[in-house]
């Protein structure tokens, strides 16, 4: 008797998912809530990143967990509450970054294989969750777009670090590209100039000068080779040239210092205080290093520094909105994305 034994071959491979290209906009991050608990969770993740605080030794860990996370969250929660989008129960940074992604996607509807998403380096939606979601949607190629015009290890590099951590755990990794800084791109400088001029046209006063305030960083980071300061200078030089302003009319300063180390100078708050004491009565401040309005622009500049200016003799103060999801702002991001997608489209 002949026995026929069925031969089972390997299971058929799953049907291929249509190949797509993912575009992921990434900004710094935000708490999930504006209460002390939410801010503490956010600050713990942010301040535990060795790209942000490079000396993560025992002294720092003791200070972070013993002092900072027990005192700073309550103070910062009050600041977040001043600017919180209560309708959506989220920070303005989250609202704006979502809008940027949606408007960028709308401008790319003729590219049906492009999938646009957004993430935060700290907080939610996390880089991990959005990269995994893009891969699940069939994105075999991924363009990560750090929304920082000027490069720094504490911003752009940590986005790359986290993206690669996520990829390291994937069996099927997408091909990855990261957009470069765009601190001197013509589209970016033109958009800044247009935004400044449009805002000034709405004011009932003419500023005597404009302060260009960038997020600060420890001077030691620059001495180790971080190009951030030189790129901030290059941005302001290009903006001065574009607007026909000299160094006395468009000043460069650095804000948001933290801790006791020396940070990049001149400091924004000290400069604004001195300008008022020296007789400047009408002032405008622009924040070219921020792609989106956030705590540092809406609270620190538009409220805290406005109060400093008025308290020391100033009379008129205006914080110029960031590019956000304006037409010019989206055009800057779109040009950057399309340039870096060459060869993939």
UniProtKB/Swiss-Prot annotation:
Gene Ontology molecular function: ferrochelatase activity; metal ion binding
Protein location: Cytoplasm
Family designation: Belongs to the ferrochelatase family.
Coiled coil, from the record: none
GO cellular component terms given for this protein: cytoplasm
Source organism, top-level taxon: Bacteria
Protein name in the entry: Ferrochelatase
Associated pathway: Porphyrin-containing compound metabolism; protoheme biosynthesis; protoheme from protoporphyrin-IX: step 1/1
Protein's job: Catalyzes the ferrous insertion into protoporphyrin IX.
Protein residues bound to Fe cation: 215, 296
Pfam family of the protein (one): Ferrochelatase
Keyword terms, alphabetized: Cytoplasm, Heme biosynthesis, Iron, Lyase, Metal-binding, Porphyrin biosynthesis
Gene Ontology annotations of biological process type: heme biosynthetic process
The enzyme's E.C. designation: 4.98.1.1
Catalytic reactions of this protein: heme b + 2 H(+) = protoporphyrin IX + Fe(2+)
């Amino acid at each position: 008797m002949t026995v026929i034994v069925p031969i089972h071959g390997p299971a058929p491979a799953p049907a291929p998912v249509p190949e797509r290209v993912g575009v992921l906009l990434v900004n710094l991050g935000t708490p999930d809530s504006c209460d002390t608990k939410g801010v503490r969770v956010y600050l713990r993740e942010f301040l535990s990143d060795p790209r942000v605080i490079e000396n993560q030794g025992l002294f720092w860990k003791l200070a972070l967990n013993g002092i900072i996370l027990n005192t700073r969250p309550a103070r910062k929660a009050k600041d977040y509450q001043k600017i919180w989008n209560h309708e959506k129960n989220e920070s303005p940074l989250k609202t704006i970054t979502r809008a940027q992604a949606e408007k960028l996607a709308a401008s790319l509807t003729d590219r049906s294989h492009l999938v646009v998403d957004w993430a935060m380096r700290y907080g939610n939606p996390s880089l991990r969750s959005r990269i995994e979601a893009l891969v699940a949607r069939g994105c075999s190629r991924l363009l990560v777009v750090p929304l920082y015009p000027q490069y720094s290890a504490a911003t752009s590099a940590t986005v790359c670090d986290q993206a690669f951590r996520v990829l390291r755990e994937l069996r099927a990794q997408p091909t990855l590209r990261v957009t470069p800084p765009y601190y001197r791109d013509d589209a970016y400088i033109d958009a800044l100039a247009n935004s400044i001029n449009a805002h000034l046209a709405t004011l009932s006063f003419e500023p005597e000068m404009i302060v260009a305030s960038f997020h600060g960083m420890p001077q030691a980071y620059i001495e180790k080779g971080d190009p951030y300061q030189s790129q901030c200078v290059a941005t302001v030089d290009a903006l001065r040239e574009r607007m026909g302003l000299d160094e006395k009319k468009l000043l460069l300063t650095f804000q948001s210092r933290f801790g006791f180390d020396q940070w990049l100078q001149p400091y924004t708050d000290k400069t604004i205080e001195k300008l008022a004491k020296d007789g400047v009565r009408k002032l405008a401040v622009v924040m070219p290093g921020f792609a989106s309005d956030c705590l540092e622009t809406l609270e620190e500049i538009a409220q805290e520094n406005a109060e400093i200016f008025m308290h020391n003799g100033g009379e008129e103060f205006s914080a110029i909105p960031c590019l956000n999801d304006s037409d010019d702002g989206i055009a800057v991001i779109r040009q950057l994305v399309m340039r870096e997608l060459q060869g993939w489209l």
